UniProtKB/Swiss-Prot annotation:
Keyword Repeat: yes
Species, as recorded: Dictyostelium discoideum (Social amoeba)
The name this protein goes by in its record: RCC1 domain-containing protein DDB_G0279253
Keywords assigned: Repeat
RCC1 repeat ranges, renumbered to this chain: 1-56, 58-134, 135-185, 197-248, 249-319, 321-384, 386-443, 454-512
InterPro entries: RCC1/BLIP-II, Reg_chr_condens, Ub_ligase/GEF_domain
Length: 512
């Protein structure tokens, strides 16, 4: 099995051993053990500037940026790897500082290996990571700036009352150069206070805002509240700074940033029992943040089968594969509900509102959604007819509607069919949306496999870092040209088991 990557690699997130900012040609990602090929790779996912790869035996590899600990490799392991990688003392000293911030090759996450934990699926946010093991336990690590790890890492929480005689006292403390003027003002104010209150100086109460400081984690840690409540998780998804998990009971749990309603307004604060009496203290300090997992309570009216997080929005698919629920930021219409208003109340979108039956379907009842995915500001649905529908941001050409990008940057607040001649005689086998670009592998309708387009790979959208893989010559200082229409990748072709995977500003291809 071979792995290819291309696009942005300035922090090693391509896994090809360097920090090239732009790679336009699909390049082999060599196994870290020196072997020629990988045995079996189950999945590759991309975060903001880091990547994660799951091997068939359950091992997890990470590479790319580690500025917040999102690779899950602690400092001792890093130092050992740095010493092995460097041959000269001067190079070693330089690289020790750099390698603490990134890894350029896939590096096994020893925490799971040592503890015999087998990883089933994973997801990367802007600077945090989640992984789910075969037993339904979730582990998190990296940035916890907005509670996105689901673990209380608070190291200080200050809430005090202070008093001052008048508003000039604060100025006295802050402006040493104006002490004389402030003292005169203080005297005048004190005289006024004495005249107005019979000689009693009134004290002004100043409430200092609660300050919550959360530590990052540079090593995976079990989210105990889910484990203690015997919640078995089957899949996870990371947004920029929020996290969503799906349980084996088809319930959804969310935590982290909720500024735009990306956790919804159905968060049930009493859904999980905690051994920590102060479990909700941070949630009270900042209502925009949920530090621990909470049930998104649909009151048994809706059960969910798939989850996906965008940058600041969330998409869910119901267990009947018929309805999509969306909530969170909607600045670009990424919720697909017909407007551009942020929504904390989940919008239920019936596919009958935008999907029409084709000659292969007798009625609308035959059509179902088999996969949902979110980009940063877009949402995608793939139907059982192998048709792709996209909504959200129109800039960079990610809607694939062949618009003139110099004239039209309009957004779409409704799901629209990706209509391309490339797909008229072919169906979409698999697809992946990254931050602002999409990769698609097609297969032929020709049962005899006489179609030369079978297993071709296409890409469109944002191409600043040449993540579309079109093999263009790279000119230093010049960005790649964005594409609003599916482009054929000239250097690679898939097979019946290959997969495309899009990351933040990069792309991967798994070729068995």
């Amino acid at each position: 099995m071979k792995i290819y990557s291309w696009g942005s690699g300035n922090l090693g997130q391509l896994g090809i051993g360097n920090t090239d900012d732009s790679v336009s040609t699909p390049t082999l990602v060599l196994p870290p053990d020196g072997k020629k090929d990988y045995e079996i790779v189950n999945d590759i996912v991309g975060g903001g500037c880091h990547s994660m790869m799951i091997i068939d035996n359950g091992d997890l590899y990470t590479f790319g940026s580690n500025d917040s600990g999102q690779l899950g490799i602690n400092s001792n392991e890093q130092q050992q790897q740095q010493q092995q990688q460097q041959q000269q003392q001067q190079q070693q000293q330089q690289q020790q500082q750099q390698q603490q911030q990134y890894q350029t090759i896939p590096t096994i996450l020893n925490y799971f290996k040592i503890n015999s934990i087998k990883i089933k699926n994973c997801s990367g946010g802007w600077a945090h990571s989640l992984a789910c093991d075969n037993n339904g336990n979730i582990y998190s690590w990296g940035s916890n700036s907005h509670g996105q790890l689901g673990i209380d890492t608070t190291c200080s929480l200050n809430s005090t009352l202070s008093t001052s005689n008048n508003k000039n006292n604060n100025n006295n403390n802050n402006n040493n150069n104006n002490n004389n003027n402030n003292n005169n003002n203080n005297n005048n104010n004190n005289n006024n206070n004495n005249n107005n209150s019979g000689g009693v100086i009134k004290k002004k109460i100043v409430l200092k805002k609660k300050k919550v400081e959360r530590k990052n984690l540079n090593e995976p840690k079990l989210i105990e509240i889910l484990f203690n409540n015997k919640i078995r998780i089957v899949s996870v998804s990371c947004g920029m700074r929020h996290s969503i998990a799906l349980s084996s009971e088809n319930d959804v749990y969310g935590w982290g940033c909720n500024k735009f309603g990306q956790l919804s307004n159905l968060i049930d604060g009493n859904s999980l029992k905690s051994n920590n009496n102060n479990n909700n203290i941070n949630d009270i300090a900042d209502p925009m943040v949920q530090d621990s997992p909470k049930l998104i309570n649909f009151k048994n009216e809706i059960k969910i089968i798939q989850i996906s997080c965008g940058f600041q929005h969330t998409l869910l698919l119901d267990i009947n594969f018929k309805n999509v629920l969306s909530f969170g930021q909607n600045k670009f219409g990424q919720l697909g509900n017909g407007n551009f208003i942020d929504q904390s109340n989940p919008c239920v979108i019936d596919i009958s509102s935008f999907i029409l039956p084709t000659s292969t379907s007798k009625s609308l009842n035959d059509i179902k959604i088999k996969e949902i995915q979110c980009g940063w500001s877009n949402s995608c649905l793939l139907t059982n007819q192998d048709k792709l529908y996209i909504c959200g941001r129109g800039e960079y050409g990610i809607l694939g509607d062949n618009r003139d990008l110099s004239l039209d940057n309009s957004n779409s607040n409704q799901f629209k069919l990706l209509n391309s001649e490339s797909f008229n005689e072919n169906k979409i086998k698999n697809f992946s949306i990254g931050s602002e670009h999409i990769l698609i592998q097609v297969y032929s309708n020709d049962n005899n496999n006489n179609n030369n387009n079978n297993n071709n790979i296409y890409s469109f959208g944002w191409n600043e870092h040449y993540q579309l893989g079109l093999c263009e010559p790279i000119i230093i200082g010049k960005d790649g040209d964005n594409k609003s229409f599916p482009q054929l990748l000239p250097s690679i072709k898939g097979n019946d088991k290959s997969l495309v995977k899009a990351g933040g500003g990069n792309s991967f291809f798994i070729l068995p």
